[in-house]
Amino acid sequence: VLQIPCIPVLDPIIGALGQYLGTRGHARPGSQHVMNAEYFSRIEAMQFALTHDDGQSSWDLNEADVVLLGVSRTSKTPTCIYLANRGIKTANVPIVPGCPIPKEVFEISKPLIIGLTKDPKRLVEIRRQRLRLLDQDENTDYVNLEMVSQEINEARRLFSKHEWPVINVSRKSIEETAATIFQLYQDRLDTQF
């Protein structure tokens, strides 16, 4: 036994709050982290987002609540993780020049499909930073403004063809993008019932 003294510094505060509110506090550590249905829904959504990141496991995309499509560096993954933390099962599929989009994207009916786009100049800046961090050559179409503009235009045409809502994430935080997606998702649920 270490014989370290325990000083209950919060007891006076909890006692005063209890007196003020006319109730007694219960000494149950961890009560703020209740494992209820909402908690398990968030865990399931998080597992789904991780399993369906970057176009993986496309065979069961119809199980998603939301599917995000976008070119590289449009914040698809962090947005999915943020939404999953709110209990929304979200998958993301990249749009990569020369690589076909999984056919399942065009066959699904349940999920809300949303396109993410970004200003080409801003996208080139972000991609350049990424290449520098990875110590990669910057002489590539990945950061060529003309090619990136073409990439974004092709993505926009795809979104328009399928009448998928589009969010320009150029000047939005992950939280703002997620809030917009959540509102679109709620609107869709409201019209289904």
Map each language-model feature to its residues.
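Long, charge-dense
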Residues: 2-42, 122-126, 130
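A glycine- and Lys/Arg-enriched "phosphate-lid" helix/loop adjacent to the NTP-binding pocket
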Residues: 20, 110-150
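Short, charged, intrinsically disordered terminal tails
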Residues: 185-193
